[in-house]
C-alpha cells in the first residue's frame, strides 16, 4: 500500500512538473510576443516623431532599431529549411516574404531578387524592408502575407507572432509609416547579412516611481550613489540634470525650427492658394465668355436654320406651281394642236403640204442644174471621142441617149431627199412620215393623196 501511494505521488509530481514546463514555455512565448509588439509600437511612434524634424535615412538610430525589431518579429519561431539528410538549416524571413507577397500588385520581389550587391537571404530581406518603406507599401505587404494563412502555417511554428492575434495589430501599426518619406541607399553597410539584428531597448525604458515610495528619485539616486562609492557626492549628480536641461533646450530649439518651417510652408501655401484663386477666377470669366459665345452661336444657327427651312418651303411651293403651269401648258398645247389640225381622214385629197411642194420645187431646180452639167460633160466627152474615132461616134451617141433616158427616168429615192417641213409642228412630222412611207414622190397627185399633208 505504501509503495503504491508513493508511486502515485511520484506520478502526480511528474505530471505536475511537465505541466509547469508547458505553462512556463507558454508564458515565455506570450511575454516575448508582447515585448516585441510593444517595442515595435514605440519604435513606430519614435520614427513618426523624428520625421517631423529630419529626414529618415540609414544613419537614423530610430530606423535602425525599427528594422531590427521588424526583423525579429518576422523571424519569430520561423521554421528551418529541411535538407535531404533530414537536418534543418536556418532560414531567413525573406523566404517567406518572397512566396507570400507575390500577389501584391507591382511588387518589388523580382527587383530585389535581381540585385547584384545583395546575395544572402537576410540581406535581401533587409533590402525589402527599405524598398517597401520608400514605396509606402510595407503595411500592404504584411497584410497580404498574413492573409495567406496556408503559406504562413507552412513557414512558422505554433506560437509565432504572425500566427497569433498580434499579427493584426502589427499590420495596423505599420500603416502609420506611409506618411513618412524615407530615403535609403541600397548599397550601404546596413544590408550586410552576416550579423543578426540587435534591438536597443534603452530608448523605450523609463522608470516610474510607485505611489508607496517615500523618497524622491533624486534622493534615491543620491543614496545609491553614496552607497556605491564614497567619492559620490551630490555635486556628482548634477550633470544628469544639466543634461536634462540641455535636452529641453534642444527640444525647444527643434520646436522653434519646426515652427519656422511650418510658417514658411504656410506662407508658400497661402501664396499658392492666392495664385490658384486668380487662375480660377480667370478660368471662370473665360468660361462665361465661352458659354455666351456658344449661346450666341446656337441662336444664330437656329435663326439660320429657320430661314433655310422657310426658303426650302418657298422653293417647294414655287416648284409645285411651275410643275402645274408646265402641265397646264402641255395640256393647252395638245388641245390647241388637236383642234387646229384635223384628222387624216378629214383632209382634202387635193390638199398639198406647202413645205413639201416648196421642197420638191427646190430639189427639182437642183436636179435640173445637175442634169445640165452632166449633159455638158457627156457632150464634151462624146466630141472628144468622135474626133479621135469617127467610127465610134455613133456608138457614143447611143450611149448618150441611153444616159439621158436613164437620167430622165430616174426616181427620187428617200436617201436623196432632205428633211422637209418643220419638226416643231405635228403636221410637218406627219408629212415627213407620209413621204417615207411612200418611198418616193412620183407625181403631185400622189403627194396630195397622202394623209399627213399640211394645209396651204
Curated annotation (Swiss-Prot):
Stretches with biased composition (Polar residues): 224-235, 382-405
Sequence positions bearing Omega-N-methylarginine: 13
Modification sites for Phosphoserine: 215-216
Keywords: Coiled coil, Methylation, Phosphoprotein
Gly residues bias spans: 8-21
Residue stretches making up the RUN domain: 57-189
Gene3D superfamilies tied to this protein: 1.20.58.900
Family, as annotated: Belongs to the RUNDC3 family.
Subunit annotation: Interacts with RAP2A.
Record protein name field: RUN domain-containing protein 3B
Amino acid at each position: 500500500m505504501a509503495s503504491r501511494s508513493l508511486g502515485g505521488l511520484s506520478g502526480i509530481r511528474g505530471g505536475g512538473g511537465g505541466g509547469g514546463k508547458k505553462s512556463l514555455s507558454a508564458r515565455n512565448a506570450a511575454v516575448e510576443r508582447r515585448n516585441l509588439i510593444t517595442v515595435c509600437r514605440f519604435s513606430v511612434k519614435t520614427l513618426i516623431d523624428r520625421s517631423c524634424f529630419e529626414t529618415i535615412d540609414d544613419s537614423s538610430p530610430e530606423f535602425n532599431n525599427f528594422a531590427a525589431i521588424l526583423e525579429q518579429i518576422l523571424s519569430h519561431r520561423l521554421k528551418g529549411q529541411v535538407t535531404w539528410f533530414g537536418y534543418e538549416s536556418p532560414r531567413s524571413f525573406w523566404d517567406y516574404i518572397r512566396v507570400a507577397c507575390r500577389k501584391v500588385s507591382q511588387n518589388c520581389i523580382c527587383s530585389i531578387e535581381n540585385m547584384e550587391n545583395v546575395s544572402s537571404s537576410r540581406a535581401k530581406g533587409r533590402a525589402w524592408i527599405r524598398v517597401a518603406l520608400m514605396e509606402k507599401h510595407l503595411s500592404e505587404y504584411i497584410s497580404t502575407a498574413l492573409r495567406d494563412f496556408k503559406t504562413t502555417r507552412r513557414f512558422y511554428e505554433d506560437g509565432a507572432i504572425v500566427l497569433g492575434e498580434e499579427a493584426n495589430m502589427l499590420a495596423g501599426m505599420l500603416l502609420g509609416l506611409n506618411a513618412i518619406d524615407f530615403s535609403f541607399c541600397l548599397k550601404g553597410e546596413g544590408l550586410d547579412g552576416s550579423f543578426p539584428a540587435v534591438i536597443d531597448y534603452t530608448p523605450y525604458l523609463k522608470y516610474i516611481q510607485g505611489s508607496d515610495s517615500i523618497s524622491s528619485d533624486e534622493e534615491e539616486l543620491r543614496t545609491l550613489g553614496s552607497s556605491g562609492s564614497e567619492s559620490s557626492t551630490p555635486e556628482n549628480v548634477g550633470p544628469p540634470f544639466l543634461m536634462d536641461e540641455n535636452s529641453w533646450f534642444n527640444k525647444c530649439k527643434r520646436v522653434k525650427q519646426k515652427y519656422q518651417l511650418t510658417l514658411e510652408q504656410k506662407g508658400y501655401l497661402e501664396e499658392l492658394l492666392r495664385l490658384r484663386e486668380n487662375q480660377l477666377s480667370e478660368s471662370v470669366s473665360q468660361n462665361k465668355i465661352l458659354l455666351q459665345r456658344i449661346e450666341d452661336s446656337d441662336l444664330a444657327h437656329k435663326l439660320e436654320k429657320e430661314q433655310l427651312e422657310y426658303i426650302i418651303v418657298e422653293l417647294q411651293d414655287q416648284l409645285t406651281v411651275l410643275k402645274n403651269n408646265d402641265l397646264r401648258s402641255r395640256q393647252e398645247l395638245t388641245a390647241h394642236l388637236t383642234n387646229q389640225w384635223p384628222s387624216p381622214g378629214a383632209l382634202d385629197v387635193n390638199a398639198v403640204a406647202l413645205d413639201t411642194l416648196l421642197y420638191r420645187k427646190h430639189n427639182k431646180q437642183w436636179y435640173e442644174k445637175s442634169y445640165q452639167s452632166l449633159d455638158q460633160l457627156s457632150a464634151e466627152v462624146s466630141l472628144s471621142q468622135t474626133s479621135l474615132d469617127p467610127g465610134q461616134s455613133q456608138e457614143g451617141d447611143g450611149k448618150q441617149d441611153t444616159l439621158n433616158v436613164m437620167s430622165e427616168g430616174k426616181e427620187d429615192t428617200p436617201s436623196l431627199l432632205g428633211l422637209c417641213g418643220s419638226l416643231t409642228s405635228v403636221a410637218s412630222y406627219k408629212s415627213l412620215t407620209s413621204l417615207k412611207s411612200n418611198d418616193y414622190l412620183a407625181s403631185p397627185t400622189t403627194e396630195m393623196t397622202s394623209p399627213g399633208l399640211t394645209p396651204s
